[in-house]
Amino acid sequence: MRYLVVSILIPFILLFNCKSVLSFDFAPEVGDIAPNFQLEGFNKNIKTKTTWELSDFQGKWLVMYFYPKDFTAGCTLEAKGFSELKKDFSKNNAEIVGISADNQDSHESFCSEKSINYTLLSDPDGIISDKYGSWIPPFSDRNTFLISPDGKISYRWISVVPINHAKEVLNVLKKKI
């Protein structure tokens, strides 16, 4: 029985780790033009807007991070980290956008309950996540991209650890300006 369990678990572990490594290969490179997107989402500060696209952020730095699921421990930690530093990002001409497979209702609840003060976008089929090498069905992988005001990938973080990630992104942003 033990061998049966091990023989079943090992392929799943290898598949998960390989996909995580492979996402690095499929993610846009620094200097590439950022893939365009048009996604529905939620921002509690902009009640009249429900759809966002890359061109909405033209002329500003964009921190675009992909994450697996609203309300999970790591995702909440990462989201709150960006929320706490939102003013610092704004002072540096940067917007923050989080993308996951969750729907708008989930994003609205997540923003309300966890005081998230920036835009969360819904990518339920992973089409945009996949363009950024960030899709491990049925979830987005935890990757972050810093997009320059002219729409190019300026920096990328693959398979992010959420603790202090927002501070790390802010420090890189400050060096880029």
What are the functions of these language-model segments?
Residues 7-17:
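Bacterial N-terminal signal peptides
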Residues 35, 61-63, 141-143:
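Short loop/turn microsegments at loop-to-beta-strand junctions
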Residues 38-61:
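A short beta-strand-turn-helix
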Residues 60-62, 67-71, 103:
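Short pre-active-site segment immediately N-terminal to redox-active cysteine/selenocysteine motifs
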Residues 66-87:
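Conserved redox-active cysteine motifs that mediate thiol-disulfide chemistry
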Residues 97, 108-143, 149:
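Short, internal strand/loop/helix patches
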Residues 140-177:
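Thiol-/selenol-based redox modules, centered on thioredoxin-like
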